[in-house]
């Protein structure tokens, strides 16, 4: 039996804070300006859960790099797809919890950091973005600045919760349609979801849209099969969200595309992530091996900290603060429609902290 564990990080930073971490914000923003200028519009950005905390979506890890919810036990990929009575119960448990957990993620709005990142793309300073997040917030932010934005400029490394597909035939549909099907088949759960929305007393939601429920019997919960399979009169297949589960690997297409983006980039800007997952860490490792300049702006220890000895620069601070100051200065001396678009939305965005998050903005 293969043992699969949730990626963890050291309890303490592997390297002491650098001089970049203690620079006043204006000087930190000036350093970012120099980094992007040298990138000449070919800098690629890599983001993680930390950038979505201010949108009310809890990060996996806190400011010290420790797992924020050590008692949380997500469904692993092999459990979800197991063809047995046990697997059937895992699917009931996953979809019941995700049915309640998806609406807060679906309804979340971009925060200022998402707007800043979209601005860097829209201005052509760092047009390509790789994100580990599955919350769709980067796309929402970019579409505000540019309704005709290129979807190909954002690569979702771990997929998106906004879509689902069946495993046997790869029939894809919007998540909202599947949510409606779940609600129709589970009226009691649907009423619970509506009550939670009315009162605001939603259970704790994790970044993958799963929630914590205790003492619940999932046997009465019905998981809809793929309706497209039924319409096409083929064997119905189980449905999963378009996200990479723990224990599942990213597709070869996404892996190759992400590595190609790094190979073609002039530099790599990392924002709000501890890089605990190998699929993201591998990209930084590749950039270092290719001698690309790398700047990381995030809080707490990360898996990539040893790369500081190989030339990676790290600012141990909240990314949004630096990005916002940099863009304030950048748009002062620039002109054009893109600049006007950015000015219109620059300091907008909704800040809605997760109810149980206190202190500094965690960037996991």
What are the functions of these language-model segments?
Residues 1-364:
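Conserved catalytic core of sirtuin-type NAD+-dependent deacylases
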């Amino acid at each position: 039996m293969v043992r699969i564990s949730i990626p963890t990080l050291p309890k303490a930073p592997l390297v002491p804070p650098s001089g970049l971490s203690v620079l006043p914000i204006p000087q930190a923003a000036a350093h970012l300006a120099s980094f992007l200028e040298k990138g000449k519009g070919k800098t690629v950005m890599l983001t993680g859960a930390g950038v979505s905390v201010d949108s009310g979506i809890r990060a996996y890890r806190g400011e010290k790099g420790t797992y924020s919810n050590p008692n949380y036990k997500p469904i692993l990929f092999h459990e979800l797809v197991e063809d047995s009575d046990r697997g059937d119960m895992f699917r009931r448990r996953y979809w019941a919890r995700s049915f309640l957990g998806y609406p807060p993620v679906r309804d979340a709005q971009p925060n200022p950091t998402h707007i800043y990142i979209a601005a860097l793309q829209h201005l052509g300073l760092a047009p390509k973005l790789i994100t580990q997040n599955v919350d769709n917030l980067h796309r929402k932010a970019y579409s505000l600045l540019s309704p005709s934005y290129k979807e190909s400029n954002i690569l979702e490394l771990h997929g998106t919760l906004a879509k689902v597909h069946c495993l046997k035939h790869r029939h894809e549909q919007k998540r909202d349609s599947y949510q409606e099907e779940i609600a129709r088949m589970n009226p009691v759960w649907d009423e619970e979801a509506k009550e939670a929305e009315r009162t605001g007393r939603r259970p704790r939601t994790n970044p993958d849209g799963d929630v914590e429920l205790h003492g619940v019997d999932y046997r009465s919960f019905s998981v809809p099969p793929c309706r497209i399979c039924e319409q096409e009169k083929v064997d119905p297949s189980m449905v999963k969200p378009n996200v990479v589960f723990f224990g599942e690997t990213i597709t070869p297409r996404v892996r190759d595309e992400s590595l190609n983006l790094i190979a073609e980039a002039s530099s790599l800007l990392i924002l709000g992530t501890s890089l605990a997952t190998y699929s993201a860490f591998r990209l930084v490792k590749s950039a270092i091996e290719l001698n690309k300049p790398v700047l990381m702006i995030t809080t707490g220890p990360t898996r990539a900290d040893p790369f500081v000895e190989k030339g990676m620069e790290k600012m141990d601070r909240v990314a949004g603060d630096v990005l916002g100051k940099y863009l304030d200065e950048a748009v002062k001396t620039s002109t054009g429609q893109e600049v006007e678009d950015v000015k219109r939305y620059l300091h907008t965005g909704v800040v809605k902290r997760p109810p149980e998050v206190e202190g500094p903005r965690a960037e996991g």
